[in-house]
C-alpha cells in the first residue's frame, strides 16, 4: 500500500491502458461476522448501476460478488446485458467445507446457464477462504480469524503449512467437481498470505492490496505470481477515503467502531478522496508495467458505509467505493441513484478510457 500524498484534483493525462480486463468489484451483499454488507437489493438499481459501470466508468469486466446465489444471478444477468465480462464470484462466509461444496456446485450451474446463453463468464470459487470459511484458520467467525492472523502468534503461523495443505485439497476437489457443471474458465480469489496450488485453475487471482508493509517489495511479490505460467489477475485492489488509508491497504476499514450504536469511526481522521486517486493511478501503472491481465478495483459502492457530515460519523471514510453512499435521498450527478461519485470515480473512468 502506499504513501499517497498527492491530491489529484486536477486532471492528469492518463496512460493508454494495457490491461485486457478493466474491472471493478460489485457487491450484491455478503455477511462477514454475521453483518450484511448490503441490506437493500433492488434489481432495477442493480441494472442501472451495472450500466453506469459499463458506460460511464468504461469497465470491460465486473466481478459480481456476494453470498446469496440468487442475487449473484440477477446481477450477473444485468452485467452481461450491459456487455461486461462477468466474473461470477460467490463469497460465502462461515460455511464449513461440507457446506461449501454443494454451494459452489449451485453457483457453477448458475454461471454455466449464463455462459451458454452467450455471456463471457469466469467462475471464481470463493474468496480468502482461510479467513471467511469455517475450519481453516482458528476462530469462531471471520472477525476472530482476521484478528488471529494479524496477531504475532508463532504457534498459529507454524500451523499454516498444514492449514493451506487442507485448503488446497479442498480447492482441488471443488474445482474438479464444478468443472462438471461449468465449461468456462475457473479461478479462486486468494489472499496474499495464502499458499495456493494453482494447478486446478486457469487463472492466478490475488487480492493485490499494497500497504506500508509490502510497498517496498510489491512488484517482486506481484512478479512471483507469474511463475505458474498462467494469466495473473488482481481480483481486488483499492484503498479507503482518508489521509493515510493507502498505508493500510486492505485493512483500512478497521477504523470503524462496530461496538458503538450506531457504528462510528474510532478516532479522528481526515477525509481525503485524493488518497484513493493516487493509489488507483499508481497501482494501475504497476499492473500495466508488470503484465497483469485484468484488475478489479475494490469496489463500486460500500452500501453499508454511508457518508455523513460529522467527521466521526462519516463511515464513507472507511469505504473503498468510488461512490459515496447517501443515507437518504438521491445524488445530483445521477438523480436516480442514492450516491454521489467520488474523485476516484472520475479517475477510474479516465484511466479506463482508451
How would you name each of these model-derived features?
Residues 14-74:
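Active-site-adjacent substrate/metal-binding segments within catalytic domains
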Residues 20-26, 60-64, 86-89, 121-125, ...:
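Hydrophobic faces of well-ordered beta-strands that scaffold small-molecule active sites
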Residues 25, 297-354:
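Aromatic-rich peripheral "rim/lid" segments of glycoside hydrolase catalytic domains that contact
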Residues 35-53, 100-111, 190-194, 277-284:
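Short, acidic/polar
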Residues 49-105, 163-184:
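Aromatic-lined substrate-binding rim segments of carbohydrate-active enzymes
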Residues 109-164, 188-193, 296:
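Active-site groove signature of glycoside hydrolases
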Residues 139-162, 247-270, 318-327:
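A solvent-exposed, charged loop/short amphipathic helix patch at secondary-structure junctions
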Residues 165, 180, 184-186, 191-265, ...:
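Glycoside hydrolase catalytic-domain groove-lining segments
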Amino acid at each position: 500500500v502506499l504513501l499517497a500524498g498527492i491530491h489529484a484534483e486536477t486532471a492528469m493525462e492518463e496512460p493508454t491502458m494495457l490491461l485486457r480486463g478493466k474491472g471493478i468489484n460489485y457487491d450484491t451483499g455478503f455477511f462477514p461476522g454475521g453483518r450484511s454488507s448490503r441490506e437493500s437489493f433492488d434489481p432495477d438499481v442493480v441494472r442501472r448501476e451495472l450500466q453506469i459501470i459499463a458506460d460511464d466508468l468504461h469497465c470491460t469486466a465486473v466481478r459480481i460478488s456476494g453470498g446469496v446465489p440468487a442475487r449473484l444471478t440477477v446481477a450477473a444477468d444485468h452485467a452481461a446485458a450491459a456487455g461486461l465480462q462477468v466474473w461470477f464470484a460467490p463469497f460465502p462466509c462461515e460455511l464449513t467445507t461440507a457446506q461449501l461444496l454443494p454451494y459452489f456446485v449451485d453457483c457453477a450451474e448458475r454461471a454455466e446457464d449464463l455462459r451458454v446463453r452467450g455471456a463471457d463468464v469466469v467462475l471464481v470459487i470463493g474468496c480468502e477462504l482461510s479467513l471467511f470459511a469455517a475450519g481453516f484458520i482458528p476462530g469462531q467467525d471471520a472477525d476472530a480469524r482476521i484478528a488471529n492472523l494479524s496477531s504475532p502468534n508463532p504457534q498459529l503461523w507454524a500451523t499454516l503449512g498444514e492449514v493451506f495443505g487442507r485448503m488446497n485439497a479442498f480447492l482441488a476437489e471443488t474445482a474438479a467437481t464444478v468443472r462438471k457443471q461449468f465449461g468456462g474458465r475457473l479461478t479462486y480469489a486468494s489472499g496474499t498470505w495464502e499458499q495456493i496450488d494453482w494447478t486446478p485453475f486457469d487463472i492466478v487471482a490475488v487480492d493485490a492490496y499494497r500497504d506500508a508493509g509490502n510497498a517496498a517489495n510489491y512488484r517482486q511479490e506481484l512478479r512471483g505470481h507469474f511463475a505458474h505460467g498462467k494469466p495473473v489477475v488482481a481480483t481486488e485492489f483499492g484503498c479507503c477515503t482518508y489521509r493515510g488509508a493507502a498505508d493500510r491497504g486492505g485493512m483500512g476499514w478497521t477504523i470503524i467502531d462496530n461496538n458503538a450504536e450506531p457504528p462510528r469511526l474510532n478516532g479522528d481522521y481526515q477525509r481525503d478522496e485524493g488518497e484513493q486517486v493516487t493509489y488507483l493511478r499508481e497501482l494501475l501503472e504497476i499492473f500495466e508495467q508488470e503484465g497483469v491481465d485484468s484488475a478489479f478495483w475494490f469496489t463500486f459502492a460500500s452500501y453499508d458505509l454511508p457518508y455523513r457530515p460529522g467527521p466521526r460519523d462519516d463511515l464513507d471514510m472507511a469505504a473503498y467505493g468510488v461512490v459515496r453512499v447517501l443515507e437518504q435521498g438521491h445524488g445530483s450527478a445521477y438523480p436516480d441513484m442514492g450516491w454521489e461519485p467520488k474523485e476516484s470515480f472520475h479517475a477510474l473512468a479516465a484511466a479506463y478510457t482508451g
